[in-house]
């Protein structure tokens, strides 16, 4: 009779130990997941700050270009540059409120079309901005030189 109790108690102790080991493993894996999520949040925060600084710099450069072209007579080419600059400014402003812009632009699209739309929008914004800034700097250097 004592042998049965010893076996039963040993079995209960072994199963309790196995459960505690399993719980420890789960808590460690959950802790690892939480640490990874926290790291990703930090990286996203840094990326957001860099993007915000870049947007501010681009807006400042675009406004400076606009004020340069605003106070004098413009050629047809400069008028076209101004139109593009205004479009870029609107796109940059829409980046400040991506949820609203996404709702307006993506109604009725599936997820693949949405991803393609944002990729195209990023290319559409960055390409002309870099071109405009390069052209403006080139024009200013020619005038100074």
Swiss-Prot record:
It is found in: Secreted. Keywords: Amidation, Amphibian defense peptide, Antibiotic, Antimicrobial, Cleavage on pair of basic residues, Cytolysis, Fungicide, Hemolysis, Secreted, Signal. Residues 1-18 form the signal peptide. InterPro entries: Bombinin. This is Maximins 3/H3 type 2. One of its GO terms (biological process) is defense response to bacterium. Its main location: secreted. Belongs to the bombinin family. Residues 19-43, 74-124 form a propeptide. It comes from the Eukaryota. Expressed by the skin glands.
């Amino acid at each position: 009779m004592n042998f049965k109790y010893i076996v039963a108690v040993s079995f209960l102790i072994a199963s309790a130990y196995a459960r505690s080991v399993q719980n420890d493993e789960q808590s460690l894996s959950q802790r690892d997941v939480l640490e990874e999520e926290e790291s990703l949040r930090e990286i996203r925060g840094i990326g957001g700050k860099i993007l915000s600084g870049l947007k501010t710099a681009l807006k400042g450069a675009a406004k400076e270009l606009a004020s340069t072209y605003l106070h004098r007579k413009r050629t047809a080419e400069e008028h076209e540059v101004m139109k593009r600059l205004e479009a870029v400014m609107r796109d940059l402003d829409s980046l400040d409120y991506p949820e609203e812009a996404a709702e307006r632009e993506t109604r009725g699209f599936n997820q693949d079309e949405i991803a393609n739309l944002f990729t195209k929008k990023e290319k559409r914004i960055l390409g002309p901005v870099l071109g405009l800034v390069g052209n403006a700097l080139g024009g200013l250097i020619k005038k100074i030189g």
